UniProtKB/Swiss-Prot annotation:
InterPro entries in alphabetical order: Ser/Thr_deHydtase_PyrdxlP-BS, Thr_synth_N, Thr_synth_N_sf, Thr_synthase-like, Threonine_Synthase, TrpB-like_PALP, TrpB-like_PALP_sf
UniProt cofactor(s): pyridoxal 5'-phosphate
Pfam families: PALP, THR4_C, Thr_synth_N
Molecular function terms from GO: pyridoxal phosphate binding; threonine synthase activity
Name listed for the protein in its UniProt record: Threonine synthase
Keyword Amino-acid biosynthesis: yes
PROSITE patterns, A to Z: DEHYDRATASE_SER_THR
Length: 475
């Protein structure tokens, strides 16, 4: 299995060769040369598998340069009930991603039972173990540079803390995460973790990461790696829970399901797209945005129009406060028939601060063939959805999951199960839950008092040169 760049000007590489990086040298994103296919018979064989067996079956089709026995050990080490221990009462932590039935054909897919209470743990824990393995095999070290709007940072840091050969430099928008998210990250005292609070918004952080990644000399000299959602291994890991969710709510492979996905950087729903391309019977992939609705605009109009920092809203679902969806390029590559020259043309416009219209050339008309639909929500919608869900079903959901549920209800079809991806637990967004319900959400006892722990972080300007200098001084 080789991986190619969406921009077509980088050599095809193996999984381990692209694992530690992010962007391809030509600025594109990596995808498999062709997607592995799972036949109806294969799906039937997978139906009864536990999460570890399912993950190994899927990942071994995407990773063929790590010996199967070693990959099996890595997967088994990653997906354990004691790692994903924060299941709801009545759920079995051994399921790793249990489903929670709200009503007939409407479910939550619980992806947030890991150490940082967010779905990012599903991929990041695997990434930490893969990084440690591959670095040890190569006798190398890496310095991870990442950007977070809230959940990626803590998931990356908890996955990489104490790992041999790894240092983490994580950029976050200063004072724009929830208190819980901030405390989760900044309270870590591990010597290999560095938190940098950037004066700006998430897209400023992401732009700095891209600028550093595109400085090939600096990247090579300082062994810069990436764990943001552009990292292929993260997307690959997320493919697994679409299969797990599908099997949990269907009796046979003749049935289709839909997934509603709270969306910012498009990485999570991109994994759903890839699962669908691999043969999973998915009816609809519902892209749910908040007020930062660049993706909703595209799926309704065919126009992709990223906003600048000044036009990016700070909302009550902050992990989705993103207006340049970095994984979107992967889907567009497939949409335009894997025409790398076309992708280079389109992202040339984006990288220059512009937009593009896929009605030109008739590409937008093909979006329906891939099952995508979309919708957006605002703060009032989120508060109402949290309140209604609590009253009707006796369950508390966070603001991002509320975005997903609100839009899911707009796209339900009779007889087709709809799984809403629960992307974070409500304890991470206490203020919003208090506003919606009048009381604080429950949080795991082990996380009581998190906000009062000592914090260690640096506040810096949104300047790639300043960040580079800090990295050089601390590696």
């Amino acid at each position: 299995m080789k991986y190619i760049s969406t921009r077509g000007q980088s050599p095809a590489l193996s999984f381990s060769e692209i694992l530690l990086g992010g962007l391809a040298p030509d600025g594109g994103l990596y995808l498999p040369e062709q997607y592995p296919q799972f036949s109806a018979d294969a799906l039937s064989a997978m139906r009864g598998m536990n999460y570890r067996d399912l993950a190994f079956t899927i990942l071994s089709r995407l990773i063929d340069d790590i010996p199967a026995d070693d990959l099996r050990i890595i997967v088994d080490k990653t997906y354990r009930a004691d790692v994903y221990a924060y299941a709801r009462p009545g759920q079995d932590a051994e399921d790793i991603t249990p489903t929670y039935k709200l009503e007939d054909d409407l479910y939550l897919l619980s992806l947030s039972n890991g150490p940082t209470l967010a779905f990012k743990d599903m991929a990041m824990q695997l990434l930490g173990n893969l990084f440690e393995y591959v670095l040890a095999q190569k006798g190398e070290t890496t310095n991870i540079l990442g950007a977070t709007s809230g959940d990626t940072g803590s998931a990356a840091e908890y996955a990489m803390r104490g790992k041999q050969g790894v240092k983490v430099f994580m950029l976050s928008p200063h004072q724009k995460m929830s208190r819980f998210q901030t405390a989760q990250m900044f309270s870590l005292q591990d010597d290999n973790i560095f938190n940098i609070a950037v004066k700006g918004v998430f897209d400023d952080c992401q732009d700095i990461v891209k600028a550093v990644s595109n400085d090939h000399a600096f990247k090579a000299k300082n062994k810069i790696g990436a764990v943001n959602s552009i990292n292929w291994a993260r997307v690959a890991a997320q493919v697994v829970y679409y299969f797990k969710g599908y099997f949990a709510v269907t009796a046979d492979n003749a049935q289709q399901v839909s997934f509603a996905v709270p969306s910012g950087n498009f990485g999570n729903v991109c994994a759903g797209h890839i699962a669908r391309m691999m043969g999973l019977p998915i009816a609809k992939l519902v892209v749910a945005t908040n007020e930062n609705d660049v993706l909703d605009e595209f799926f309704k109009t065919g126009v992709y129009r990223p906003r600048g920092s000044a036009n990016t809203y700070h909302t009550s679902s902050p992990s989705m406060d993103i207006s340049k969806a970095s994984n979107f390029e992967r889907f567009v590559f497939d949409l335009v028939g894997r025409d790398a020259a076309k992708v280079r043309e389109l992202w040339g416009k984006v990288d220059a601060g512009g937009s593009f219209d896929l009605n030109d050339g008739g590409w937008f008309a093909k979006v329906a063939d891939y099952g995508f639909v979309s919708g957006s929500s605002n703060h009032a919608n989120r508060m109402q959805t949290i309140k209604a869900t609590h009253e009707r079903y006796g369950v508390t959901i966070d603001t991002h999951t509320a975005d997903g549920l609100k839009v899911a209800l707009e796209h339900r079809e009779a007889g087709t199960p709809m799984l809403v991806l629960e992307t974070a637990l409500p304890a991470k967004f206490e203020d919003a839950i208090v506003e919606a319900l009048g009381h604080k959400p429950e949080r795991p006892h082990s996380l009581e008092g998190l906000e009062s722990l000592p914090q260690r972080f640096e506040v810096m300007e949104a300047d790639a040169a300043v960040i580079k200098q800090f990295i050089v001084e601390h590696i």
